[in-house]
């Protein structure tokens, strides 16, 4: 067992010994799954799905997937059941535990971003290794497969088309790994999604001990949301605001095995 495994095991044991309900929140791309130049090619590995299903079905735990993808997209790619919470578009849409949330900005921003999608996509088509992903309430310029120069040009394309709306504070940008996202200018992010889910889990179980795992800049808000009352793990060498870091999805899978073992060893069900 690695040092990271040992530390997580100790934290889980301590939380369970205090009789707390485990709330596992995890990102998808780069955390549960390896990155791919084509987002449509990413699916959850069966071995990792089995571990997550074991956690989700345990009455001592609740599982939540917090992703920048559309909610239905990440649900389809994980193939996890109704016991799991899903937060899509960095929390603009959330479902789970019989509850649903859709931020008012979700519908307001779609028409504006739709008008920008075609000209941005047309300009990106001239840059090798770049493409535009239209999520509805957000647009993402991807450049993982591009040269450094074309990646910078892709960012410039997005910013040029969006500039009037950025200056008017109607839209904002969010950076991630080899991507730049254009989205509604609202104070809502993965940390807000974590708080929303935690509040609903607390209503059901009376308590929740949050464990957040993520790999990207967009996960920093999630790390901060659990600070002081939970544990955060960066699935990349860059720990950022996380409590500690592991090296990618393979080590995340190892951590999930630790969690399932500790749940099996834990005491009374809450």
Q: What are these model-derived regions, one by one?
A:
Residues 34-36, 96, 242:
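A short acidic, helix-capping loop that chelates divalent metal ions and anchors anionic groups
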Residues 22-24, 84, 210:
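The start of beta-strands in P-loop NTPase/AAA+ ATPase cores
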Residues 2-6, 19, 193-270:
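Mg2+-dependent phosphoryl-transfer enzymes with acidic/Ser/Thr/Gly-rich catalytic loops
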Residues 1-28, 32-36, 47, 79, ...:
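Non-catalytic pre-domain segments flanking phosphatase-related domains
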Residues 98-106, 191, 247-251:
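Short, surface-exposed amphipathic charged segments that create phosphate/polyanion-binding patches used
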Residues 119, 127, 133-211, 217-230, ...:
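Conserved acidic, metal-coordinating active-site core of Asp-based
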Residues 43-135:
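Active-site phosphate-binding/coordination module
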């Amino acid at each position: 067992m690695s040092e990271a495994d040992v530390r997580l095991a100790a934290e889980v044991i301590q939380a369970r010994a205090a009789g707390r309900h485990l709330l596992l929140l995890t990102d998808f791309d780069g955390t549960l799954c390896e990155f791919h130049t084509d987002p449509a090619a990413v699916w959850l590995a069966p071995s990792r799905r089995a571990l997550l299903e074991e956690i989700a079905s345990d009455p001592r735990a609740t599982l939540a997937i917090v992703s920048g993808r559309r909610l239905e997209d990440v649900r389809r790619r994980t193939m996890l059941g109704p016991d799991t919470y899903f937060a899509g578009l960095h929390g603009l849409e959330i479902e789970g535990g019989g509850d649903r949330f859709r931020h008012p900005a979700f519908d307001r921003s779609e028409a504006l971003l739709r008008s920008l999608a075609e000209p941005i996509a047309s300009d990106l088509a001239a840059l090798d290794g770049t493409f535009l992903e239209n999520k509805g309430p957000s647009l993402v310029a991807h450049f993982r497969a591009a040269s450094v120069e074309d990646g910078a040009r892709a960012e410039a394309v997005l910013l040029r088309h969006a500039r009037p709306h950025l200056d008017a504070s109607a839209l904002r940008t969010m950076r991630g790994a080899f991507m730049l996202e254009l989205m509604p200018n609202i104070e809502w992010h993965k940390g807000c999604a974590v708080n929303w889910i935690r509040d609903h889990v607390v209503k059901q179980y009376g308590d929740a001990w949050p464990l957040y795992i993520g790999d990207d800049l967009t996960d920093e808000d999630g790390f901060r949301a659990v600070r002081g009352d939970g544990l955060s793990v960066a699935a990349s060498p860059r720990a950022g605001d996380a409590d500690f870091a592991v090296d990618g999805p393979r080590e995340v899978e190892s951590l999930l095995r630790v969690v399932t073992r500790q749940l099996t060893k834990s005491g009374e069900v809450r």
